[in-house]
Amino acid sequence: MKDLKSIKKLKILLTDVDCVLTDGGMYYTSDGDVMKKFHTRDGMGANLLRKSGIPTIIVTKEKTKIVRRWAKKMNIEHVYDGIQNKESIIPIIMKKYNVKTSEIGYIGD
C-alpha cells in the first residue's frame, strides 16, 4: 500500500533510453550509422501518462537525432540528451516544473 501512495504523488516521469525504451542492442547501417529499436508500447505508456497530466521526460547520456525524432513522434515534450551526470538535471527539472523530488519517478541507470 505504501508504494501505491507514492505513485499517486507522481507528477513527472524521467526515463533513460537504452535498455528502457529500447532493447539495448547496438545496430548499425552498412555505412556505420547507429540505429535504435524502440517498442511501440513504450510510446503508448508515455501517451497515457501525458493524458493523465504526467509528462515523460527523456534524460540520456547519448546525443543522437534518433532519440529526438522518436520523442517527437511519441509527443514527449522534453529530451535532455548529452547528460553525463543524470542527477545534475534534477534541480533544473524541479524548478521548471515546480515539483519536489518525491514527485519525480525515474526509470534507468
What residues fall within each predicted segment?
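Non-catalytic pre-domain segments flanking phosphatase-related domains
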Residues: M1-V17
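Short coil/turn segments at beta-strand junctions that form active-site/ligand-binding loops
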Residues: K9-K11, I54, S102-E103
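Chalcogenol-based redox active-site neighborhoods
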Residues: V20, G32, K73-M74, V99, ...
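A positional/architectural concept
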Residues: L21-K51, K61
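Substrate-recognition element of Asp-dependent hydrolases with the DxDx(T/V) motif
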Residues: A46-W70, Y80
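Feature captures the catalytic cores and cofactor-binding loops of soluble hydro-lyases/lyases
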Residues: K65, I83-I92
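Short hydrophobic/aromatic-enriched beta-strand-loop microsegments
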Residues: I76-Q84, E103-Y106
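Conserved Lys-Pro-Asp/Glu-containing loop-to-beta segment of HAD-superfamily phosphomonoesterases
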Residues: I90-D109
